[in-house]
């Protein structure tokens, strides 16, 4: 918790209020898809856990393979939809200063790529959850927190556009 608070403080002081707001507006537009990701993860995990309980390796492989294909399809459709919506958002919905439009578009495209990769990653998370390997999740959580702190330090000390650097690295 303390590392997260310190990271937020570093990012806010590095980006400034305007760029931090731009990042949150654009990120918030994409993060609303989190419910879709959570729903898909729960459905996939349910089937994987059931097959794990049966001990049927062939069924687990079939479920995993079908899940991969379905999630790749959903990821492609989501990517297409988000790229279409991008034109609408940047041509009237978002109120972004003209000099920051390029940086905002880079952040949006980075968020779209991150969303696509997160959707494709769902079946792998479901396998880990089905095995109930919580040590793995706790280690990943600690690593993620430290990685966010490292990204904050990179943003503080970079000479490049801090908003683009932060958007691409997150």
List PLM regions with ranges.
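Short alpha-helical transmembrane interface motifs in multi-pass membrane proteins
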Residues: 27-31, 70, 105-110, 133-137
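Alpha-helical transmembrane segments and their helix-entry boundary regions
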Residues: 20-21, 126, 134-138, 163-167
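Transmembrane-helix boundary and interhelical linker motifs in polytopic inner-membrane proteins
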Residues: 16-17, 33-71, 90-94, 123-124, ...
């Amino acid at each position: 918790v303390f590392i997260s608070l310190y990271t937020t403080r570093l990012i806010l002081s590095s980006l400034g209020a305007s760029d931090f707001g731009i990042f949150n507006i654009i990120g918030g537009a994409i993060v609303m898809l989190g419910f879709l990701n959570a729903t898909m993860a729960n459905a996939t995990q349910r089937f994987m856990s059931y097959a794990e309980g049966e001990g049927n390796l062939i069924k687990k492989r079939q479920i995993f393979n079908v899940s991969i294909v379905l999630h790749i399809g959903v990821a492609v459709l989501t990517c297409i939809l988000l790229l279409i919506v991008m034109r609408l958002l940047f041509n009237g919905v978002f109120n972004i200063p003209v000099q920051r439009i390029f940086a905002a578009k880079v952040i949006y495209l980075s968020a779209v790529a991150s969303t696509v990769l997160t959707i494709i990653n769902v079946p792998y998370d479901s396998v880990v959850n089905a095995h109930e390997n919580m040590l793995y999740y706790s280690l990943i959580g600690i690593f993620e927190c430290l990685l966010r702190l490292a990204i904050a330090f990179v943003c503080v000390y970079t000479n490049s556009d801090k908003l683009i650097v932060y958007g691409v690295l997150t």
